[in-house]
Every structure is written in structure tokens, then in C-alpha cells.
């Protein structure tokens, strides 16, 4: 029933409403987000046709799969099966590797960075290839989460402390660069003036494509 299907479409595609569109082939699975501008159907033709116009402030198609690179001085090593003897066993392993590596198979794009842990001071993320950096001035308390978004059109720096989220973009040190991921392998390293060993850093990335 064409009329029934048309009304089902209207229930999903509503002008001025948010919409998320998925596109998939055997090689790629992506999505885009936007606001429905119009949904126009030709109701009185033998072959029903229509056109949906969607305004997308973010111009990219994003992979449905997320990649995460992590830094922590302590790497988890806990196992739920306990040893049968009384010998000591590790619940964590101390890491001397400050490098985070992530591969970008899409176009150059920004990413999300989460810094937590603490106490620490003046956390800094460096691009290992260019020495460009982002530094947040000030203290990180135990339980804090700093979230940095470097995506075009959506650059933010926020602090979540005791359940309250505040804008701290003013704590971004002068000379900092809004870091991005180039195509291919990207390496970043972590520094802090105090408390580096207590920091946990997560770099969250989805491959992004201008066309699919």
C-alpha cells in the first residue's frame, strides 16, 4: 500500500527534526547526521517518487566502528581465575610507553580526547611527527574528566567535576594546536608537569569521509 508507506515515511522523516542516515556496502558502513529540510512526495503520479533534503552541519560520513587508543602508566592485567598457589600475581603492569598510535583510513579529521585520573597538572598531548601540541593549564583532581573535541565546527574543551560539566576552553594554553588525524598512522605522546603516572588518556576516532 503506497499511501501507508508514505505515511510511515512521514513518521520518520519530519521537517526541522534531527535524522541519522546509514549507508552500507560490502566495503564500508557509514552514517551522517543532519536536520530534515523538506520531504516532498509526488502523490498523484503512477510511479510515486519523492525527494528528501537534509541539512548536515557536519559534512562528513562517519564509520560506524569506533577506534580507541589509550595511554595509562598502569595497564590492566587482572584475571578472574585466581592462581591455585600463594605466589603473588599482577593486577596491573607498569608501562613506560607514553605513545598512543592510531590509524586513520579516512580523510584528515579531528577527534575526541578524554583525560582522566589525577591528581596531575598541565597535561599535554604532542603529535610525535610534528611536535604540535595541546596543553591544558592547571590541575586535574582525582575523578575529573577533561574532554577535548578537535572536529571542524565543533571545537570544545570541557571539564566534568563531581557531576558538573563546565567549559574550560580558556585553560587551553596559547600556542596550542587543534590536533587532527592525518591519513595513515598517527602517533601522540603524553606529558604533564606533575602526576603523569596517574593520568589516563583515551583518543576516540571514527574514520570520516567527504564522499562515499
What positions do the PLM features span?
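Generic ordered-secondary-structure signal
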Residues: 12-15, 19, 23, 45, ...
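Short, surface-exposed linear patches
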Residues: 13-16, 42-45, 55-56, 74-78, ...
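Short, charged, solvent-exposed linker or helix-capping segments at domain edges/interfaces
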Residues: 62-70
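Intrinsically disordered, low-complexity segments enriched in serine, threonine, and glycine
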Residues: 69-212
Amino acid at each position: 500500500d503506497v499511501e501507508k508507506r508514505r505515511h510511515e515515511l512521514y513518521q520518520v522523516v519530519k521537517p526541522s527534526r534531527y535524522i541519522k542516515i546509514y549507508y552500507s556496502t560490502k566495503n564500508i558502513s557509514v552514517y551522517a547526521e543532519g536536520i530534515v529540510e523538506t520531504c516532498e512526495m509526488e502523490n498523484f503520479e503512477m510511479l510515486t517518487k519523492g525527494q528528501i533534503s537534509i541539512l548536515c552541519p557536519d559534512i562528513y560520513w562517519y564509520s560506524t566502528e569506533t577506534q580507541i587508543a589509550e595511554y595509562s602508566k598502569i595497564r590492566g592485567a587482572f584475571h578472574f581465575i585466581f592462581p591455585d598457589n600463594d605466589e603473588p600475581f599482577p593486577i596491573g603492569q607498569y608501562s613506560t610507553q607514553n605513545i598512543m598510535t592510531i590509524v586513520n583510513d579516512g580523510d584528515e579529521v579531528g577527534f575526541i580526547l578524554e583525560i582522566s585520573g589525577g591528581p596531575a597538572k598541565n597535561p599535554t598531548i604532542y603529535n610525535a611527527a610534528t611536535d604540535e601540541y595541546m596543553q591544558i593549564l592547571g590541575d586535574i583532581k582525582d575523578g575529573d574528566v577533561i574532554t577535548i573535541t578537535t572536529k571542524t565546527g565543533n571545537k570544545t574543551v570541557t571539564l566534568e567535576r563531581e557531576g558538573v560539566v563546565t567549559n574550560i576552553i580558556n585553560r587551553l594554553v596559547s600556542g596550542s594546536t587543534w590536533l587532527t588525524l592525518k591519513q595513515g598512522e598517527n602517533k601522540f605522546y603524553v606529558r604533564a608537569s606533575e602526576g603523569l603516572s596517574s593520568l589516563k588518556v583515551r583518543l576516540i576516532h571514527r574514520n570520516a569521509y567527504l564522499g562515499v
